[in-house]
């Protein structure tokens, strides 16, 4: 990160940060995409099992990665104030925090998840695949969270290309392990859909090993003196949790409501479950665009706010939101035209393809709502405003999605589509609430700047 002098320099810097994050996010979401697509080609029953498992896994995992992502605004403010010597200390505190959170998530997966899966009315074969998938996936919990901390460090330093290169390794690693374990290639035991969980875990262990080597060999990071081990500092841990808990809670509130809808789908047929999950999976892949804008906004805004250049932060906000709209125009057009082709990536049954394509039509409205709401979350994190957005997200997602969806399901014949309608409306409401909060925060900082002149 560096100070910019004009709009053109800001645009160039923003895009330099954004594009590597975008590629990183695509690579990140590709792990789930590869698991779902390869399992769908194996058979629909295993796909239904994996979809139920990810409905439980995603909320808890994203909650914890949301907590450790608080490292980005913390380091951003240090850099904006010229306190680079504080970076290494905060990095190690978040490493310790990630290890502790790994134990929490492991306990949830091993003890809580099977109980949920066995009490939601799933077919026995589907439940068996889901439980085995989660157990295998739990092997990769530690590298998943530790890599999230390393990635947050690199992003906050503006080294988003390095994050991108590391994450690009995930796709071939995950695909290779999945091929071996799902289909039982080259004499490896055939594990079916559950093998996708083990494939992802092994891929992340390899990725973590490579990332640690890069961390201590990269010239640009040597000035941080990361080789010096720093002891646990409970004050900094508490600060990280205080800032990160609302971030994780906001992400959890959004992802969990999608997952609850996925679990509600258990009352429908295996075909509907598989089609719903496939459409939702591709929607998540497309979410990489607004999510990347959000991450880039958190980096640039936190840097400018830390340096007390509030007008520059405001300029970046405009650039980010316009970038989100431009990309949305392309992704919406692509998905509308090729929704049938996209559906065929997940299976070859004509009924499955037709049903998935219908769900994908609803996902167009997801993308439109996310284009508005997601960047606002990143902007608010850049201002270190996380507590109120958490409550707003809770209200927007849980106060709207499930009640509206249940109402549509009861009063209309929309069936499974009712729950997509509820989710779309909740995203729109949440976006409006975030926009209101940003207006309040920006006025507060403008008043602060005027009072110090």
UniProtKB/Swiss-Prot annotation:
Family, per the entry?
Belongs to the multi antimicrobial extrusion (MATE) (TC 2.A.66.1) family.
Sorted alphabetically, the Gene Ontology cellular component annotations on this record are: plasma membrane
What is this protein's name?
Probable multidrug resistance protein NorM
> Where found in the cell?
Cell membrane
Keyword vocabulary terms for this entry = Antiport, Cell membrane, Ion transport, Membrane, Transmembrane, Transmembrane helix, Transport
Recorded hits in Pfam families, A to Z, give: MatE
What residue intervals traverse the membrane?
12-34, 54-76, 96-118, 128-150, 162-184, 194-216, 243-265, 285-307, 319-338, 358-380, 387-406, 416-438
According to Swiss-Prot or TrEMBL, what is its membrane topology? Multi-pass membrane protein
A Gene Ontology biological process in which this protein takes part is:
monoatomic ion transport
Q: Which GO terms describe its molecular function?
A: antiporter activity; xenobiotic transmembrane transporter activity
> Which organism encodes this protein?
Streptococcus pneumoniae (strain ATCC BAA-255 / R6)
Its biological function?
Answer: Multidrug efflux pump.
